[in-house]
Amino acid sequence: MGRIIGIDLGTTNSCVAVLDGDKPRVIENAEGDRTTPSIIAYTNDGETLVGQSAKRQAVTNPENTLFAIKRLIGRRFQDKEVQRDIDIMPFKIVGADNGDAWVEAKGEKMAPPQVSAEVLKKMKKTAEDYLGEEVTGAVITVPAYFNDSQRQATKDAGRIAGLEVKRIINEPTAAALAYGMDKKQGDNVVAVYDLGGGTFDISIIEIDEVDGEHTFEVLATNGDTHLGGEDFDNRVINYLVEEFKKDQGIDLRKDPLAMQRLKEAGEKAKIELSSSQQTEVNLPYITADATGPKHLAIKLTRAKLESLVEDLVKNSLNPLKQALADSDLSVGDINDIILVGGQTRMPLVQKYVTEFFGKEPRKDVNPDEAVAVGAAIQGGVLSGDVKDVLLLDVTPLSLGIETMGGVMTALIEKNTTIPTKKSQTFSTAEDNQSAVTVHVLQGERKQSSGNKSLGQFNLEGIRPAARGVPQIEVTFDLDADGILHVSAKDKDTGKEQKITIKASSGLSDEEVEKMVADAEANKEADKKFEELIQARNQADGMVHATRKQLEEVGDALSAEDKAPIEEALSALETAVKGEDKAEIEAKTQELIQASSKLMEAAQAQQAAAGGAEGAEQQASSGQANDDVVDAEFEEVKDDDKK
């Protein structure tokens, strides 16, 4: 068997790895980078650009530069997640004839697998250039919480790229493989927290090592397939748009070119704030009106960024708690925490994860490369080059059929180890019923309509009989890729109907084949600057904390008491935009003094609720010399997030 490469097909970046002897190696692309932006552009001269070259020209070609396609793959156009993205993407998202979400570039409608295939082709070529031989086999990773439709669509993308997809494996599982192969001692329970560009997964995985044999068993998985770095970027972009609108009276959302520049600058600012306390978004000539060109120059502090995205980070807590519950484990049972995905570099994310688990996550796992490395290891297992490794993954969602009364009856429960096969006997609902419709569903709701419809088929030719007499055996066979095969058999006549679930939509084999064919053809100054940034950070934190308190206990104050607070807030927000540290500090103190009645109201409310300790903490958060950012986080610590 030829080499089987491992590909991490990411929302923001992709990565390819291969076994080099018995060690996995991440392969650099033609530009010398170990990861490739998952960006595809279609130019005026008919050229298709992938990766960094596509990213570089995005500002001048926003409508034909496609990114974050993974958020659309295997989704219906009417899905709320898709409708949300339509308003923020510079390119067109359209509905296909079969109801799927497609994209449009250069006037041509394209299926997401067709677009993703361009990234996979670059990964394939990268591997071939390194190995000096043709590569046809691949293990491709997907978010653990991808449903059947999304997994099928990913396999389709592989086929279109000219790859035989040997296995689809879950990203957290792949990361655990990369982490666990060099851990030689005993047993370990790890939590893989995977926050990437477009998706979030949490998996609890038990790694057993006995006499050199490794078993990786997924105990539970959970997540959100529409939560990731792109959402963090969008919060930054929206903030910049609103600030510019307040300053200049111009809405940049109507200008695709400006929005593309903002996207690039917003992402860069977010990344910079992981290692610095302040950055400035400076975009000259962002737009123009009758008075002439307009320039965008907005300072962004880490405290402000964190206030913008705090709820997103919290949103990962519930899946985390659910995964622990499903695995019958407590936080104390987790030996190690692995962070995967570029967004986990954000200090706020690391803070929440550390507080939740009560321990620091590991720092020896590369969040950008671990998934591809794990996929390459699995490729080695499949090709026979890696021995003594057993991978036991699970299905993320329950699978079942619709039964009488619109109820979903599950045949395969969530977190069942795959592959698996389950059968159950059903009967007719009416007398002399000659046919039954098998409606296949995926999800956790008892009401059928609350779940994802994967498809349906009919079993006909049932002999006339009273209701409840015929015996129809329905079998669900879930393969190692997490893809479902369903059969229904009449035990009386022996008649049987089988299908491989292709979702109620998706690409037909003919469409995939056509796409396959198409794809072929200086010290003081520094000290002063640091002090200025510190003052800005403190001011931003104070503004955020005060506004939060106004929302929570503002009703307890009269309009006369609120007015000076709002006035002080406005004055401080204006001062923060300037370069005068003394002015910022003075306005911060004025806000603290103006907010005294607000603090008293908050203390009174907490005391009434029996929260003396909380009231003490709340009072301390208004002190000028406190680290305002920390105090702000202490306020929400009970809710903490991931």
Swiss-Prot record:
Residues 627-642 have a biased composition (Acidic residues). PROSITE patterns: HSP70_1 (PS00297), HSP70_2 (PS00329), HSP70_3 (PS01036). Residues 605-624 have a biased composition (Low complexity). Induction: By stress conditions e.g. heat shock. Keywords: ATP-binding, Chaperone, Nucleotide-binding, Phosphoprotein, Stress response. GO terms for molecular function: ATP binding; ATP-dependent protein folding chaperone; unfolded protein binding. Residues 605-642 are annotated as: Disordered. The modification Phosphothreonine is found at T199. Belongs to the heat shock protein 70 family. Acts as a chaperone. PANTHER family: HEAT SHOCK PROTEIN 70KDA. NCBIfam families: PRK00290.1 (NF001413), PRK05183.1 (NF003520), prok_dnaK (TIGR02350). This is Chaperone protein DnaK. It comes from Alteromonas mediterranea (strain DSM 17117 / CIP 110805 / LMG 28347 / Deep ecotype).
